[in-house]
Amino acid sequence: MIIAGSDGPISLSIPVVGGRSVKVSYKEVQIDYTGNWQRDHFRTLCTAYGNSAFFMFYRDELEILYKESPVFLYEWNLSCLHWLSKKLKIEKIINIKNDGLSIPESFDDDLYKPQSLGNDSDNKLFRYHQVFQDKTGFLPNLSILDPLFNLGPDVKSYLLNASTKL
């Protein structure tokens, strides 16, 4: 995931057992807990978004999420997805079945992809205030956490409005 920091974009990734070169199915990718990525990610989010308008309303729940220690990466991703679904008030649920992901037919995944809002030069009307915007300029295509922490409950209507203008 990519978030906005004071010096520009920050990439946060979860280490996996065997690294990127491991050749296993998605549901078999295990998280590597030899480092303290959870603490580092959470601290980075606190530093980057501590002064945003809505971070304080999500901080405690996010901290609980970062204290979870699922074995598999898909479990972490699913926990995050369910948390975000609640925050965005998305009622369609994505479930894991033995044969893979189950996504409702009417689920519009393009709406929630960063590139769906286009690039910065094409979509100046989709801007919102970012914490370090005065220093870095507007940074497009960041994690959903960026508009969530900056727009709060209005993030869903922002995404819906932006998607109808593409």
Predicted regions located by residue number:
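Residues lining hydrophobic/aromatic ligand-binding pockets adjacent to catalytic sites
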Residues: 1-166
